Amino acid sequence: MIVLLQRVLEAQVVRRAEGEQAEEPLGAVGRGLLAFVCAEPGDSTAVIAKAARKTARLRIFEDENGRMNLSAADIGGGVLVVSQFTLAADCTSGSRPSFSNGASPAEAQKAYLAYVEAL
């Protein structure tokens, strides 16, 4: 499992239907983390649980002394999780990336839901 984390003051994911102006909010978070998650073939429940634990406990927020010493949980922050299969892209040869390092859609959905549940 590949997880890319971004500290955010706020973040949201919206969907806009083709030809429409209105956006439909799908998820949002205030101060906390935006987690882009990519499942890889064979991700075990242990790997997924470890990734979720690491996300929740990673001390990347400043404490009162300005040191990165607090986790998202410590600051009462949330985590907005976005499935992002492109993190598995292999661009080592040619001009077209290969996504063979990513899990199948069914396996990825299962891993994504397990990650969210473990958070």
Model-derived features: positions:
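N-terminal, polar/charged subdomain of small-to-medium soluble alpha/beta proteins
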Residues: 1-94, 110-119
